[in-house]
Amino acid sequence: VIDGRPQFLDRHLQRMLTGAKISDFEIVHYEEMGSGLVELLSRASTGTHRLRITASPESTLMTLTEFQGYTGEIDLGIAPWRLSQSRPLQMSKSTSYGDYWYARKWATEMGFDDALLLNNQEEIMEVSTANIFFLNKGEWVTPHENSGVFPGVIRSILLEMNFAKQVDLASAALSGFSACFVTSSLRLIQPVKKIDGLSIDNSPFMKDLHSLRQELESIAYA
């Protein structure tokens, strides 16, 4: 939420409805949520905030907290365990977040900014808090949803824009990528400078990434 205006709100609400359907429950008081949301947003008329809506069969909770934002390039470490690409709740954003929380905790303790997650086929999935994109032989690619990827909002937008295509990405291919960045609604676009000690030189593409970020900002409130 920037200066009281929520970004990509329609997409987040649709994803929440989809997640509830996958989990086989109806969100209580969904139609009345709007008035509560308006009141909550009135407290965030200036500055940047993180809005979180958590729905269950019994209740819906909305919270708003100040957010400082992400800056600079990040350093990723490959988590030492593998995740199943066929988890039943993988396609929905749920409170079943233990694997991702622990991966982020591990990364921080090891001196990384975040953890890169692989599935049990040794394929690249995502970062614990973001989706990931690579430049491969002049073409932007992102891990295929069949690898167990969570379908993030920014990832979906970039695919709709035909900016990148989904492919299966073996972890062994990491050394062959020319550039890398991660995406999330809180980050938009954030370059990756290292993965497990492997340096990535994004400098030739920073202008393009800046332009992409500006394009996302221009449609954030649509």
Language-model regions: role of each:
Residues 1-31, 35-39, 43, 56-222:
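Helix-start/capping segments and mature chain N-termini
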Residues 47-51:
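Hydrophobic alpha-helical interaction segments
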